[in-house]
């Protein structure tokens, strides 16, 4: 079974990852195939593993999580029909329920623009840019993010003191075996973290099997893409962090626990459903539905861990095409616009980077620029503590992990999972498609549900939105000529939502009295699409995270700041209060009431809220199911969702300040 799936996965991965840019450098079919390790022949557990669902423990560690029931039902509908348009919309707007990521992420990755047309900045280009750009760096090897990146690509970012001492050891003659040994060494660091840095540790047979799959997945990626990028420890960390949400062994629920979870026996694995058992138990039939997805499903998604890992890396490490190639395509398509392109380089960079994205060097510079503009006090404190001056492995490499590797290793798995949701759901609107096309793809989603998903996080004012523009002007007490603003084109390009007004018909299936009354009552509604490049959006998410930790950071010294940001704590995780028996009893009663009053994902609104006088008072679209253990505990609910929303506010604040400065 594993051999067949390996053959199928290698064929599909070679089909999906080929592109004109990359195939010229690497032809996946010419890469030597790696034999599956013997551990893969071990038969995975067939029955459901022991779960904490339904059991009550005074040491009940649960991540805070709540989710609108109507959006959940819509997500389930899209998942059952493999509707990647609908899943991408929900994923970028609200995030995916964490216990469904192992089925949703493969569907999103298969259709992701960065997977369909991949481009990863080759190491040679990085070295050329490294030698030519010496902006604000010292002459030491760790003086700039670029130099540190090259050393990390060669030696591994985590190669600190103990790693360099290991280098003099004799290396295997086989280059494949040499890479495998590096992967094993980086996997060992993860194990040491979770085994409390014990000098000697043992792993179970199940843990060994999972780690072997991760090792094999990283090795095969390097053999396929090794002519573009060399092995780097970040690849192993991406595999480890993916395994915290996607079970490496097919048809099992076992995932890595991550750093936020601790078990009495220091186990590396946990049941996928355990963390969210409170939420799962509050929705009838959801547990059986999830178990069917885990143990029986082969229709929705049967992508292997190796295939998902490869596609995830292509998304996280994606880089836009070099400027020279972009200019060649622009010459053929926009020759008239090139005459107007002789603008100041700084302004061109600021007005194009949010839409096109940039290299890691450009993103680091842009991050520092936005930090000074949006968080001046924190930026000044960082300057005093000499933060963001050196980017070597002992300095500010945390920023490289934040921006280039999208929070791999340094963020909590709960925060990182939600941010990866946002990035995997990123989709641009095809200008050749109209509203009716996408509305049909969304299966004519209810207008109220669409409004509940909200606008794109990084919405901005469109040039045709005169009312909003006038409101901005009045609030600032100024007027400006939009035609003279160098940000005019940027705003127009970013204003890409598909709107439908009461003057426009949707489709034959929507042209009825009920829908027409909806259109008459409200002038318009829209389908939100992504506006800002996801890696640029990640910069504002990172700034939002720093803003939320600002009060803590200003109390720390240089070393403490770097340690703190290299292992950023989460607020999405809350420990249950100790030994309160009445709290346990309250949870039992509230859980039973919620279970009887909630709707099944397949249920109807008429079954809602049987203990209330008027069921209309609590319709389906207002029910929020929570993962909290008891109602009187003060959980930090939706911390990362608030961070993402705040990042949109920071984006608009930056855009507005640039518009003012530009005048």
UniProtKB/Swiss-Prot annotation:
Location of the protein in the cell: Cytoplasm
Source taxon at top rank: Eukaryota
A GO CC term assigned to this protein in UniProt: cytoplasm
Keyword terms, alphabetized: Cytoplasm
Biased composition (Basic and acidic residues): 163-178
Biased composition (Low complexity): 7-23, 130-144, 589-611
Keyword Cytoplasm: yes
Domain Rab-GAP TBC: from-to ranges: 95-427
Chief location category: cytoplasm
Sequence segments annotated as region (Disordered): 1-28, 126-178, 575-611
UniProt record similarity statement: Belongs to the OCA5 family.
Protein name: Oxidant-induced cell-cycle arrest protein 5
Organism: Candida tropicalis (strain ATCC MYA-3404 / T1) (Yeast)
